[in-house]
């Protein structure tokens, strides 16, 4: 792996497409997406996820991936926090969706007037084993609503960003990719990488 190649560690095809669409500034001759002087490639790794804050989880994943791949890596952790629950389920949202489904998520807030939620995306960039992990975080405020739109991308169909009348799932991908929590985090990462 070239030192100018960053491996984005994910097995989620939808997430990979979205990250490439947002992050890429060009395409290299070999068809790889580029941001600044870096080419972006992908690898699926089964990394242990510790319990902790989104920052702790992201740092741990980035260090583990860098140790396995012996080079620059990018990892991501996303959380969805309900204001009524003091920002839980937070980084455990994937397990909540898997256990109780999207309707279960909505039902959790049934008795609460406050349906507010924070979608938080944190990317961790690590240049290699023993290197410091740099974090890039984006937040989008919104509300939890009954599921609308396709249900093939996490909790997108139950999250309606503030100021919009559509859920992430109902939005055109191009529009979503200019306002999402992932976009806000990747915008910071792109600035960092293009200035290296």
From Swiss-Prot:
Protein residues bound to Mg(2+): 49
Principal location: cytoplasm
Pfam families assigned: Ham1p_like (PF01725)
Record EC number: 3.6.1.66
Record's subcellular location: Cytoplasm; Nucleus
GO BP field: deoxyribonucleoside triphosphate catabolic process; nucleotide metabolic process
Record keyword RNA-binding present: no
Binding site for ITP: 10-15, 61, 77-78, 94, 153-156, 176, 181-182
Molecular function terms, GO-annotated: dITP diphosphatase activity; ITP diphosphatase activity; metal ion binding; nucleotide binding; XTP diphosphatase activity
Gene3D superfamilies referenced in this protein's UniProt entry, alphabetically: 3.90.950.10
Keyword ATP-binding: no
Keywords, in A-Z order: Cytoplasm, Hydrolase, Magnesium, Manganese, Metal-binding, Nucleotide metabolism, Nucleotide-binding, Nucleus
Cofactor or coenzyme needed: Mg(2+); Mn(2+)
Cofactor binding comment, as recorded: Binds 1 divalent metal cation per subunit; can use either Mg(2+) or Mn(2+).
One annotated Gene Ontology cellular component of this protein: nucleus
Catalytic reaction annotation: ITP + H2O = IMP + diphosphate + H(+); dITP + H2O = dIMP + diphosphate + H(+); XTP + H2O = XMP + diphosphate + H(+)
Family from the record: Belongs to the HAM1 NTPase family.
Subunit record text: Homodimer.
PANTHER family linked: INOSINE TRIPHOSPHATE PYROPHOSPHATASE, INOSINE TRIPHOSPHATE PYROPHOSPHATASE/HAM1 PROTEIN
Listed NCBIfam families: RdgB/HAM1 family non-canonical purine NTP pyrophosphatase
Task of the protein: Pyrophosphatase that hydrolyzes non-canonical purine nucleotides such as inosine triphosphate (ITP), deoxyinosine triphosphate (dITP) or xanthosine 5'-triphosphate (XTP) to their respective monophosphate derivatives. The enzyme does not distinguish between the deoxy- and ribose forms. Probably excludes non-canonical purines from RNA and DNA precursor pools, thus preventing their incorporation into RNA and DNA and avoiding chromosomal lesions.
Protein name: Inosine triphosphate pyrophosphatase
Native source organism of the sequence: Debaryomyces hansenii (strain ATCC 36239 / CBS 767 / BCRC 21394 / JCM 1990 / NBRC 0083 / IGC 2968)
Gene name of this polypeptide: HAM1
């Amino acid at each position: 792996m070239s030192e100018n190649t960053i491996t984005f560690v994910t097995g989620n095809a939808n997430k990979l497409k979205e990250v490439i669409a947002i992050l890429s500034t060009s395409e290299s001759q070999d068809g790889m997406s580029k941001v600044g002087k870096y080419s972006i490639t992908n690898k699926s790794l089964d990394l242990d996820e510790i319990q902790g804050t989104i920052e702790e989880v992201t740092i741990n994943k980035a260090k583990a991936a860098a140790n396995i791949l012996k080079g620059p890596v990018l990892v991501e952790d996303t959380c969805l926090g309900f204001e009524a629950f003091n920002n839980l389920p937070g980084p455990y949202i994937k397990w909540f969706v898997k256990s109780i489904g999207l309707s279960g998520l909505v039902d959790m807030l049934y008795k609460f007037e406050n349906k507010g939620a924070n979608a938080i995306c944190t990317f961790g960039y690590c240049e290699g084993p023993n290197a410091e992990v740099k974090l890039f975080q984006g937040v989008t405020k919104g509300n939890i609503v009954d599921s609308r739109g396709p249900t093939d991308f996490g909790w997108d169909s139950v999250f309606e960003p503030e100021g919009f009348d559509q859920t992430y799932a109902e939005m055109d991908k191009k529009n979503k990719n200019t306002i999402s929590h992932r976009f806000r985090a990747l915008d910071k990462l792109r600035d960092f990488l293009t200035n290296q």
